[in-house]
């Protein structure tokens, strides 16, 4: 039995609330149970130096946790003077995931920066961030199309992410913090709306896990991401 009493194949309650920041070109508050991530997508004219003159844009991401996102207050990374390795890993993952479904040439020499700030953490912050980031990016690119800033829709497909793990010997979908902390194995899956793989991160935490267990986790992920893609479409109006 899961601590939350959910069935093994059941997501936490998920909401993707849009328009939560009046200034950003696109914004979303992604809530997966008690995990809440505020995402904004902002247009910046110009691109990083390595892309100048190449006629294409860029999508990048930044990720951070508010000091009281967890049970005890953590120091702001800015106050420490450097980002943790975890932060750098997660924001690179978010950026890669978004770029996998964007036609960068359609942006011209412009950059969209997607900021993902964890307001409250109860497991699955990176997967919630990716799922909400696509919503914010979709809204931002639609705004740019409507304003005539770009002429072609750069969004090629949806992308969403979910965690799965082996908990008490059972493959389960969408781990909360208690499950994640006690999982025998866990994995993060990033898939497109078409079902293509963008990234899989899988780790045996307390033991190795079998190919059959991995296939069970992958099947759960496909089911969960299918449901998340439906919620993304509903949040963005199709």
Swiss-Prot record:
Keywords: Nucleotidyltransferase, RNA-binding, rRNA processing, Transferase, tRNA processing, tRNA-binding
InterPro entries reported for this sequence: ExoRNase_PH_dom1, ExoRNase_PH_dom2, ExoRNase_PH_dom2_sf, PNPase/RNase_PH_dom_sf, Ribosomal_Su5_D2-typ_SF, RNase_PH, RNase_PH_bac-type, RNase_PH_CS
GO biological process, one term: rRNA catabolic process
CDD domains in alphabetical order: RNase_PH_bact
An example molecular function term from Gene Ontology annotations: 3'-5'-RNA exonuclease activity
EC number: 2.7.7.56
Purpose of the protein: Phosphorolytic 3'-5' exoribonuclease that plays an important role in tRNA 3'-end maturation. Removes nucleotide residues following the 3'-CCA terminus of tRNAs; can also add nucleotides to the ends of RNA molecules by using nucleoside diphosphates as substrates, but this may not be physiologically important. Probably plays a role in initiation of 16S rRNA degradation (leading to ribosome degradation) during starvation.
Name listed for the protein in its UniProt record: Ribonuclease PH
The species this protein was found in: Phenylobacterium zucineum (strain HLK1)
Upper classification of the organism: Bacteria, Pseudomonadati, Pseudomonadota, Alphaproteobacteria, Caulobacterales
Gene: rph
């Amino acid at each position: 039995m899961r601590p939350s009493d959910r069935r093994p194949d059941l997501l936490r309650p998920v909401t993707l609330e849009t328009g939560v920041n009046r200034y950003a070109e696109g914004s979303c508050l992604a809530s997966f149970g008690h995990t809440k991530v505020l995402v904004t997508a902002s247009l910046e004219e110009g691109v990083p130096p390595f892309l100048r003159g190449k006629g294409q844009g860029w999508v990048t991401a930044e990720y951070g946790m508010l000091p009281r996102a967890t049970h005890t207050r953590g120091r702001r990374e800015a106050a420490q003077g450097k980002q943790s390795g975890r932060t750098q890993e997660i924001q690179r993952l978010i950026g890669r995931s978004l770029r996998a479904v964007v036609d960068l040439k359609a942006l011209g020499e412009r950059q969209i920066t997607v900021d993902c700030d964890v307001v409250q953490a109860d497991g699955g912050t990176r997967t919630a961030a990716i799922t909400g980031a696509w919503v914010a990016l979709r809204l931002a690119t639609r705004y740019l199309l409507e304003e005539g800033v770009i002429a072609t829709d750069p969004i090629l497909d949806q992308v969403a992410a979910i965690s799965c793990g082996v908990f008490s010997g059972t493959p389960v979908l969408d781990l909360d913090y208690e499950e994640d902390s006690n999982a025998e194995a866990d994995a993060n899956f990033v898939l497109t709306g078409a079902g293509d793989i963008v990234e899989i991160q899988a780790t045996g935490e307390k033991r190795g896990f079998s190919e059959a267990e991995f296939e069970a986790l992958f099947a759960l992920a496909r089911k969960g991401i299918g449901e998340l893609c439906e919620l993304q479409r509903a949040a963005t109006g199709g």
